[in-house]
Amino acid sequence: MSQRRHFKMSVTAKNFYRRPLPETCIEFSSELGKKLFTEALVRGSANIYFKLASQFRTQDEPAYCGLSTLVMVLNALEVDPEKVWKAPWRFYHESMLDCCVPLENIRKSGINLQQFSCLAKCNRLKSTVSYGDNSPDFLKKFRTSLVNSVRSDDQVLVASYDRSVLGQTGSGHFSPLAAYHEDSDQVLIMDVARFKYPPHWVKLETLQKALCSVDVTTKLPRGLVELELKKGTRPLIMYGLKAYVNINDSDFATSVISWNQFLLCDPLEDDEEEFQLCCRKFGQCFAPHAMCCTQKTFDADQKNSCTECSTDQNEACKMICSEIRRTRFAEVFSSSAVAALLIAWPFEKGYSERSDRIGNLAEKYKNEFSAETMNEMNQLTTQIRTLISCSKPPVVININKPDATSNKCCKNKIGQSCACANDVNL
């Protein structure tokens, strides 16, 4: 006689197979959903759908809606990351979006609208953020942006919204918008949490309300992000900021504040001493954050080795490295990555005499660089500027003339030299 085995299922383990859509949403695969899509397609208001559908993905982690949405958009817009995902393929994956916010933090808490935009900019996308509000003007602008996006094949509109306003479970969520049905004023949401909800149509006014929900982490409304590839660019292939540098990195924020305060001080009378002082101060602030993208270690960069570039990038890497090392900045720094960071620094004209001097020298070199090196500097400037603007605590570069009495050292108080010189190891 056979024995029957009894298996017990834990009563504490709660799990779900998807969620039913609320009445506010129309399932994409329903008869009505198909009808709405067909009519939108005939009117040319679903062009971007095909690019998005070809890269439609399910978020890898419960809190990865923002990352997965961005990966979907990057691949849909055919952005070459010029990084290998799985050999030999170059393709965007969530694990490759390792700037702005630590991946471990995102896995736990997700990202907000500002962080999403930061990641987009660091990956060569034009990113325009519109925070939600309930005004008719916002709804009109929303509709215009949506129509422009869905009728194109190179612009994507992403919504950061509150699910609960749509009658769904959960709160903050990201997903791209793929089609618009004009007669019913409904938009197709390509929900990246496909394990929870399928793609669905929703009234534009309803989604507008969901965009107005305040994100508790930023105290700002959610909203929209218009994304488009910056044409004629390539990603950073030689230099960059280390992966741990992100908008929550207080060390980086502190370094930026210290550097900005240094720039406010009076320059030294001797030009060579002033140049050396500025370079040493910058190195003190940012050498720990600078990285040569082709090297595994700081020592390798010091040895001027570019052997780890991929074959198709090798010549470009060598050219960029060579041009940076021919500058006066590289004569001071042991790492060309720090020199590149200084040359690419987003100096604001008129910020201070010291800032203008060092900024003008950096600009002189940039004007002499090849197209490859200039692209590298422009991309690095974008990365730096984006991280500065998003840093917590906020790092604000005030381009207006600062209050000299509160922020600036006075020569007559410290002999004939800038007080900040005492803080820099020459």
From Swiss-Prot:
It comes from Caenorhabditis elegans. Its EC number is 2.3.2.15. It holds the Pfam family Phytochelatin. GO terms for biological process: cellular detoxification of cadmium ion; detoxification of cadmium ion; detoxification of copper ion; detoxification of mercury ion; detoxification of zinc ion; phytochelatin biosynthetic process. The keyword Secreted does not apply. This is Glutathione gamma-glutamylcysteinyltransferase. The lineage of its organism: Eukaryota, Metazoa, Ecdysozoa, Nematoda, Chromadorea. Expressed in hypodermis, pharyngeal grinder, pharyngeal-intestinal valve, body wall and vulval muscles, and coelomocytes. Expressed in posterior pharyngeal cells and anal valve. Disruption phenotype: RNAi-mediated knockdown causes hypersensitivity to Cd(2+), specifically causes a reduction in growth, impairs development and reduces fertility. The gene is pcs-1. InterPro entries: Papain-like_cys_pep_sf, PCS-like, PCS_N, PCS_N_sf. It catalyses: [Glu(-Cys)](n)-Gly + glutathione + H(+) = [Glu(-Cys)](n+1)-Gly + glycine.
